[in-house]
Amino acid sequence: MAKDRTKDLTRGTPWKVIAGFSLPVIGGNLFQLFYTLADSMIVGRTLGADALAAVGATATIVYFVLCFIQGLTGGCGILLGQAFGAGNEKQVRESVSVSVWISALFTIVLTVLCCSMVHPILRMLNTPVDIYDRTYTYLFIIFLGNGATVFYNMISNILRALGDSRTPLYFLIFSSLLNVVLDVVFIVPFDMDVAGAAWATVLAQAISAALCIVFALKRFTILHLSAREWRFSAETAWRHLKVGFPMGFQMSVMCIGQLAMQAAVNRIGTSAIAGYTAANKVDQLSVLVDNAVGIGIANYVAQNYGAGKMDRIKKGVWHCFLMLTAMNFAMGALLLLGQSFVVPMFVTNPTAEIMQYSKDYLFTVVPFYFFLGALLIYRTAIQSVGNTWAPFAACVIELAARILCASVLSVPFGYRAVCFATPFAWLTALSLLIPVYIVLIRKLDGGQSTQTKN
């Protein structure tokens, strides 16, 4: 496997190994944020606040689908990482094969289901009448491109499980730049309105996914499977789905709470949607960085668990906790100091009302970034040793907390209660995961280092 330029995460100083792996992922996530920001900025500044609200009103449901895709493909990647850490090339190839099969079948089901549910989804989200048609157009096109999202995440998670976090970064950078160019072309000279922004996103990701797959096949000989290895194995698929589906559902459950928040914001009106969307876009900066380190710790823990190195797992988790705490403090301070520049990035001559909605969100959520970092670290560490029930239970608790604030407390306390739903959900989920992590690590230290069966 050395010829494949894979990376062994079971050796070296934990924080250096994790940081070296995570930095390209952070770079990729920042570019991903860049093109979503560019998407919103181009839409808002060329088409107006209503167009920005139309795109923003779909953000949560698009993220909901994306989270399930990332969870499903990420779960498959965990098993691949464990096999790679154990040096079992046969299982690595089996994992690659079944990941492709699962991705192909899932793409068909997901695309048909999502495209047929656009109207019910928009009604559920209380989408305002004045932006309904634009919102429908944007969301339907994005759903048509689900296949590109599935296969990009599939190949990215396969490569990361093999220790390569740079190749996905390079193609994400390409996709980001292409997306911005297509945004401008489709919206300005072609006058395609929000449909242009949607098609730009879909085409950019599809091209990136295709090129990434071709490049990976040329670079990594371990991905060259024989016809026999491509045969579908129900047993192998079930092993992957037992990890992938709980992770997908877990990440989607988190988004259900965000859907409740979006619905509550939509009830307030277009100004609230615009302010909430602008603040949420820059808030994603910290979330994406934390998620990138979470991907790093997931692959690190999976490989070391496969190699039976429990001490390295504990050190790596602690090092990640310290890194994220420092980064979240710095990013939080930057966002709060620069909050007055957020809305003008997306809307020309914004009203005072839109500015206030954005400010309220940031000053409510940003001070609690510490809990987000800890949540992502402990959740991914627990998942990567094969335990899926605890992270899923934590997500159910998180869902209940978000719905309580967004749907119940927002009635008497208004918009601020919707904003507070996010940090409150982080804290409640973390209260379960930390004790579970401590107990789990003690059991593994006691010699029970076989893969957890759920």
Enumerate the language-model features and the residues they cover.
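Hydrophobic transmembrane alpha-helices of multi-pass small-molecule transporters
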Residues: 64-67, 111, 179-184, 209-213, ...
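Residue-level signal for short hydrophobic patches within transmembrane helices
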Residues: 15-34, 38, 61, 65-68, ...
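Transmembrane helical elements of multi-pass membrane transporters/channels
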Residues: 20-39, 141, 175, 204-208, ...
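Short runs within selected transmembrane alpha-helices of multi-pass transporters and secretion channels
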Residues: 73, 141-160, 168-176, 197-212, ...
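Short alpha-helical transmembrane segments in multi-pass integral membrane proteins
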Residues: 1-22, 80-147, 189-245, 301-368, ...
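Transmembrane alpha-helix boundary and packing residues in multipass membrane permease domains
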Residues: 25, 29, 41, 78, ...
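Small-residue-rich hydrophobic transmembrane alpha-helices
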Residues: 52-112, 149-168, 275-339, 372-386, ...
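Helix-terminus/linker motif at the lipid-water interface of multi-pass membrane proteins
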Residues: 34-53, 122-129, 185-192, 252-285, ...
